[in-house]
């Protein structure tokens, strides 16, 4: 059980949302220029990005605006044929993937060993950590930061894989308070349930993770991370629950997900205390530490601010390679990120003449 430890002492696809840029290294342009390979070398060939995505993910991510900008910047996206050996395809500069399964993971690990010069986004072993909600938030709970302009923790939660009739007793032993958010153990599923009373708990279907519901004013902050870049958008979320709700509601309320792209809250008329974004320094240090600990460069964090506070935040979920198509201006952020990988680890390859996948 993650006990909801705090951090610091100081302060799962549609629609477009207004951009809120919150993090970029101040001297990013100077650093990029200093690290960049000779312009002639970059122009000599395209940057080839092989992608292995589900058809749904490919459609939402590889939108025309991304493909068009990528072509202008010399980036070519090529579909990977999962039925053929990876070594027989390419050559690739970068492999971008979001597939699960032991067979794919083994193929990719073997490819990484044979082609260490290719950047794989991200290592399969690191991705595994975010696919299981029992362990997903452990790194957040173990962070020990100081002077980060706020406190970050995780709600109390309990892993349940037992007979449903025994769940109320397990919840009581763990010291969790109702209502509880029930989440499937496997993070691929976005369906959530809210249980208001002990009887409701017996209607749940393990294995799952139970998480204390924290009132947060009905607003959630989606923090998108692409390498060193951070973007934040506000989304409408579940409303606050008061004592009256606990008394008058019973049963299990199911939700397809806590937030959705159509529920963008950036332009809504919100209480300023609810709408205020988490402090930039807090997000920067949190993202940096999670990148280091998780070994990932493409993920997002779902954060909430405890209602009635200004500096107490909770991370309630994380996702690998989230729906970047919903992130404002994602095509610019993502193409810049891909080019930065070449600037840091530039290696000359034969030209690639195949058509886009």
From Swiss-Prot:
The keyword Transferase applies. The keyword Kinase applies. Its cofactor is Mg(2+). GO terms for cellular component: cytoplasm. Gene3D superfamilies: ATP-grasp fold, B domain. One of its GO terms (biological process) is inositol trisphosphate metabolic process. Pfam families: Ins134_P3_kin, Ins134_P3_kin_N. It catalyses: 1D-myo-inositol 3,4,5,6-tetrakisphosphate + ATP = 1D-myo-inositol 1,3,4,5,6-pentakisphosphate + ADP + H(+); 1D-myo-inositol 1,3,4-trisphosphate + ATP = 1D-myo-inositol 1,3,4,5-tetrakisphosphate + ADP + H(+); 1D-myo-inositol 1,3,4-trisphosphate + ATP = 1D-myo-inositol 1,3,4,6-tetrakisphosphate + ADP + H(+). Disulfide bonds: none annotated. One of its GO terms (molecular function) is ATP binding. InterPro entries: Inositol_tetrakis-P_1-kinase (IPR008656), InsP(3)kin_ATP-grasp (IPR040464), ITPK1_N (IPR041429). ATP binds at residues 133, 183, 211-222, 237, 262. It comes from the Eukaryota. Keywords: ATP-binding, Kinase, Magnesium, Metal-binding, Nucleotide-binding, Transferase. Binds 2 magnesium ions per subunit. Its EC number is 2.7.1.134, 2.7.1.159. Kinase that can phosphorylate various inositol polyphosphate such as Ins(3,4,5,6)P4 or Ins(1,3,4)P3 and participates in phytic acid biosynthesis in developing seeds. Phytic acid is the primary storage form of phosphorus in cereal grains and other plant seeds. Monomer. This is Inositol-tetrakisphosphate 1-kinase 3. It comes from Oryza sativa subsp. indica (Rice). The lineage of its organism: Eukaryota, Viridiplantae, Streptophyta, Embryophyta, Tracheophyta. The gene is ITPK3.
């Amino acid at each position: 059980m993650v006990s909801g430890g705090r951090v610091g002492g100081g302060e799962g696809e549609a629609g477009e949302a207004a951009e809120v840029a919150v993090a970029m290294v101040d001297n990013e342009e100077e650093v990029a220029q200093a690290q960049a390979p000779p312009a002639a070398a970059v122009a000599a060939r395209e940057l080839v990005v092989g992608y292995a995505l589900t058809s749904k993910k490919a459609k939402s991510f590889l939108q025309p605006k991304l493909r068009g900008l990528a072509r202008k910047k010399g980036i070519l996206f090529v579909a990977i044929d999962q039925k053929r050996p990876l070594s027989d395809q390419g050559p690739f500069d970068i492999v971008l993937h979001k597939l699960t399964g032991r067979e794919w993971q083994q193929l990719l690990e073997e490819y990484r060993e044979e082609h260490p010069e290719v950047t794989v986004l991200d290592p399969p072993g690191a991705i595994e950590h975010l696919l299981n909600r029992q362990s997903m938030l452990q790194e957040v709970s173990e962070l020990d930061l100081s002077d980060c302009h706020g406190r970050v923790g995780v709600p109390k939660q309990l892993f349940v894989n037992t007979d449903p009739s025994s769940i109320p007793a397990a919840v009581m032993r763990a010291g969790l308070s109702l209502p509880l958010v029930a989440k499937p153990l496997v993070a691929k599923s976005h369906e959530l349930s809210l249980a208001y009373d002990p009887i409701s708990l017996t209607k749940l279907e393990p294995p799952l993770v139970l998480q204390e519901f924290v009132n947060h004013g009905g607003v959630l902050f989606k923090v998108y991370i692409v390498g060193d870049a951070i973007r934040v958008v506000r989304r409408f979320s579940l409303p606050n629950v008061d004592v009256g709700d606990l008394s008058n509601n019973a049963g299990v309320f199911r939700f397809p997900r806590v937030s959705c792209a159509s529920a963008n809250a950036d332009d809504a008329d919100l209480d300023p205390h609810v709408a205020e974004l988490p402090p930039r320094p807090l997000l920067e240090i949190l993202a940096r530490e999670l990148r280091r600990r998780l070994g990932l460069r493409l993920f997002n964090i779902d954060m909430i601010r405890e209602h009635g506070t200004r500096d107490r935040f909770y991370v309630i979920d994380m996702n690998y390679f989230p729906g970047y198509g919903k992130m404002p201006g994602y095509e610019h952020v993502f193409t810049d990120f891909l080019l930065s990988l070449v600037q840091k680890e530039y290696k000359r390859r034969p030209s690639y003449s195949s058509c886009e996948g």
